[in-house]
């Protein structure tokens, strides 16, 4: 019986450590969400080495992804769970500016933290083409 009480107490303590202040009583998973964009050229080939900047339109703040480099050529992280404290649960506009050499494109996104834990894309393109 004593072992069972200790086990239950340990589980409750572990779960309490995962609770998110913006979601009273809620538990966040250990997953780490990232919103990505694939950048292609006029021939629909992946573009590597592009400069990608995501800006939170409401504040003008640059959102810096905390994820490591992605291993898919032409795919870039825009926003990840490292920015959940900046994004409204109901959603925020994010503008992505992407360039390489003389070519550039901007794309508009809406991202949210609807569950109080993880970034999710409400709208915006999966792929953009440099022009």
Residue ranges and their predicted role:
Residues 98-124:
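Structured interaction patches on ligand/partner-binding surfaces of diverse proteins
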Residues 18-34, 40-43, 119-131:
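Beta-strand-rich domain onsets/edges
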Residues 69-93:
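Short Pro-Gly-centered beta-turn/loop motif in secreted/extracellular proteins
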Residues 1-18:
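Sec-dependent bacterial lipoprotein signal peptides
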Residues 35, 48-52, 92-94:
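Short beta-strand/loop motifs in extracellular/secreted proteins, especially
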Residues 43-69:
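Short, ordered, surface-exposed loop/turn motifs in non-cytosolic proteins
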Residues 62-74, 110-113:
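Solvent-exposed serine/threonine-rich low-complexity stretches and specific carbohydrate-binding patches
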